[in-house]
A protein has these predicted regions:
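Conserved active-site tyrosine of GNAT-family acetyltransferases
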Residues: 19-24, 90, 118
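Short glycine-/small-residue motifs
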Residues: 123
């Protein structure tokens, strides 16, 4: 069988600069600006992983974000330590929480925030094994 490895997340945005600034402010993303095919491109690194931001032109046939919940890709998760402090920091920065911090089962604490373009982001802490 072939070997598969994780490569990236791809986000479409009407305002890539604002989207990148949000992830940088909220999650400490490293914003990487470059040129591709003569056009500006914005990518990010979050937790060592690649996140690409594709611009959505004003006049395009790209649909708006769906109403949640919906089928298909639901969210991506960012693991942290000291989640109580992280949640307090995110609230101080104005993050919009769609699910407050809770413990769905022993050893895991989670919450969800809504990012630009309606992207759902889980922030979680797993107890050491």
């Amino acid at each position: 069988m072939s070997t598969f490895t994780y490569d990236h997340i791809h986000i479409r945005s009407r305002d890539p600069e604002n989207t990148a600034a949000y992830y940088e402010r909220m999650f400490g993303a490293q914003v990487i600006r470059s040129m591709q095919d003569g056009k500006p491109r914005i990518d990010m690194k979050i937790g060592g992983q690649d996140v690409f931001i594709a611009p959505v032109p004003e006049k395009s046939n790209v649909n708006p974000p769906p109403v949640t919940p919906y089928q298909g890709l639901d969210h991506f998760g960012l693991r942290v330590t000291n989640i109580d402090k992280v949640v307090a920091d995110l609230k101080a920065k104005g993050a919009e929480f769609t699910m407050e911090l809770n413990e769905p089962r022993p050893g895991i604490k989670i919450c969800f925030v809504r990012g630009p373009e309606g992207v759902s982001i889980e922030v979680l802490e797993r107890a050491p094994k």
